[in-house]
């Protein structure tokens, strides 16, 4: 059997799991399709007996379909629009990202958490949730159970943010503009940002959704420097002495991140020439669906019992990151006079 045909059963299995997960994600956006895909994959893995037939396809999906999803994610980014509208929130974005990464780095040893999981929780909390985890996992060569753990933690605090932040913003007396920046900088995933801003708009008859989404998209651009930095750090760590002979920037930097940037540039150029942003809608949707497929594959490769037993430290780290990001976002708004 050819290599491509050997991958087909695993690909089809991931596709079959992704379809109901996608539908469930549409019904319950506060949870999201990627989380449903991981859960379905982990549940099936408990009693699935045909791993030899599907192993190659599942592995291909969790790696290459995931990388393709990240590339297609770039078609949702108009760099001109993001930079024009998002510049006001840039100091807050930089502060919250730096805070989460420092917290994750500082607490990893204290919590006795593996480096990859701590990195994924920090990156996912600070940048763009599941998409950031998807982009970072191949760079640091994270295992599937580490990815599943990080996604689960991020989902938990996404849900809490969507439920609590509208009331918190009202209690603190945030303006509509202030809440848009707060939601865009302190909530992890795009779907949760949308849910949080929509809940605020329903309470206040406002339109914070557009502003929150653009702030969130500005955060997404941090994928580029963060993944580059992590890939260089990992490459240097794997070599005791970095010389021209044993270190190559081209080999260290993941190509799919370069294609992500290229996709963003294409979107920016085409929209500046008058092409409607809606023209890229199908590519953005395909990106989201590929992430769901990849999460199904990751779920299939994850031991649910082990995840439950070892997930406590990751949840604690996620909680500390979440609280730290929330406080820094609000403090920066106050200091900049936006609040």
Swiss-Prot record:
UniProt subcellular location: Cell membrane
Membrane-traversing stretches: 25-47, 60-79, 84-106, 118-140, 150-172, 256-275, 290-307, 314-336
Keyword check for Repeat: no
Superkingdom of this protein's organism: Bacteria
Pfam family membership, one: Cons_hypoth698
Annotated Gene Ontology cellular component terms: plasma membrane
Record keyword Ribosomal protein present: no
Membrane topology: Multi-pass membrane protein
Keyword list, A-Z: Cell membrane, Membrane, Transmembrane, Transmembrane helix
Family that this chain belongs to: Belongs to the UPF0324 family.
Name of the protein in its database record: UPF0324 membrane protein SPy_1056/M5005_Spy0779
